[in-house]
């Protein structure tokens, strides 16, 4: 099963260059990478505004503004000296075939994880997290979920491919333990009986960052963690370019501080999703996503340097 392309493959959406100007590596399974970046240009499960398939391209493009900083503030070290990161480009699948995308993404992830790599993925709409969770659970067992979002995505509507149902499905499949999982920034209707700890946007905006992080760490414990960041967790003032924006969200400053504070968790996989550049202004949504992705890599590099 072919899941990745090459430089001549015209089915690819965003493979001009890699994240942070990293060279493309279309054979990441045999590389010496610690973390592999994969773009998933998919938005067929979107319920609002489409366009998330162009998210990986937008994140990579704007990341050129971040590539110049060797000793990134406030970390004061070069992530690339501690962590070997490669960008393998985008998942290749038949556009219009959601099932093929899901199967190929899971197969790609399983192959990477079996080769000892870890994954940072760029959506695409949030549905892409479900096949990633399936692959990670095969490798790491049941996981805790740390989920930044405006929506809980725990809705049971009977639709197989929907970006609002993944975290209803994942506990039922035994992929994640909701009692050790936390959802941050929520500000839409949700089922309060699904087992997740919900730190809604009002709490997150009013409480101190250290207080929130202490609660997250207590809930998660020492379980393997999958970290997923839906960019609509941010207020539309900071991230207008997304499919289902909701006012009253987090500032980019608060989000970055919270992500940095997750360094001590046992994070085994990560993604940033729901960037839809057609609705962006001055690339600020893509820049927020790229910056958060870079911070995710820095927390891994910081841990490796200890």
UniProtKB/Swiss-Prot annotation:
GO terms for biological process: putrescine biosynthetic process from arginine, via agmatine; spermidine biosynthetic process. Mn(2+) binds at residues 126, 149, 151, 153, 230, 232. InterPro entries: Agmatinase (IPR023694), Agmatinase-rel (IPR005925), Ureohydrolase (IPR006035), Ureohydrolase_dom_sf (IPR023696), Ureohydrolase_Mn_BS (IPR020855). Its cofactor is Mn(2+). It is an enzyme of class 3 (hydrolase). CDD domains: Agmatinase_PAH. Keywords: Hydrolase, Manganese, Metal-binding, Polyamine biosynthesis, Putrescine biosynthesis, Spermidine biosynthesis. Pathway: Amine and polyamine biosynthesis; putrescine biosynthesis via agmatine pathway; putrescine from agmatine: step 1/1. Its EC number is 3.5.3.11. GO terms for molecular function: agmatinase activity; manganese ion binding. It catalyses: agmatine + H2O = urea + putrescine. The keyword 4Fe-4S does not apply. Belongs to the arginase family. Agmatinase subfamily. Catalyzes the formation of putrescine from agmatine. PANTHER family: ARGINASE/AGMATINASE, GUANIDINO ACID HYDROLASE, MITOCHONDRIAL. This is Agmatinase. It comes from Salmonella typhimurium (strain LT2 / SGSC1412 / ATCC 700720).
